[in-house]
Amino acid sequence: MPQKKKIPFSRPYDQQNFNPPAPVMEVSLSIPGTQPQLQSVILKSPALLDSGADITVIPEQIVQQLQLKYVDEITASGYDGVPKQTFIYSVKLIFDDLGDFIVRAIASNNDHVLVGRDILNKWSLLLEGKKKIFEIK
C-alpha cells in the first residue's frame, strides 16, 4: 500500500550544521526491492535539498553499510567542474511525510545526502530564505 503523503510539508532551515543555513530534512535509505517484513537495514541521514545537483548523491559510507551494488557508470562533475568517471548505485530513499523513491545515485565523501533535481522536480519546493524555512507541496 503506498504511503500517504502529508502535503504541504514545512520545516526550518538547518542553522546548526550549515553556514549559511540550508534546507535539510531527514531521509531513510535502504536497498531497493526489500520487503518491509524482511528486517532490512535502514539507515538515516540528513539530506540537503540541492537544486544545483542533477542527481541525488549519497555518502560512500552508506553505500558500504548497505552493500549497494553499482548498476552503471557515468561521467559527473562536482562544483569544481572537473569531470570524473563514477559509479551509479540504485537506492531507496524514504521521506516519512513525502513518499518513497528508488533512484540512481552517485556516491561522495559527504556525510549527508544531497537530494538532487531527480527527486526535487517531483515536488513544488519553496525556499523562504528570509524566514529560514522551506515548504514542499
What residue spans do the PLM features occupy?
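Pepsin/retropepsin-fold aspartyl endopeptidases
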Residues: 1-137
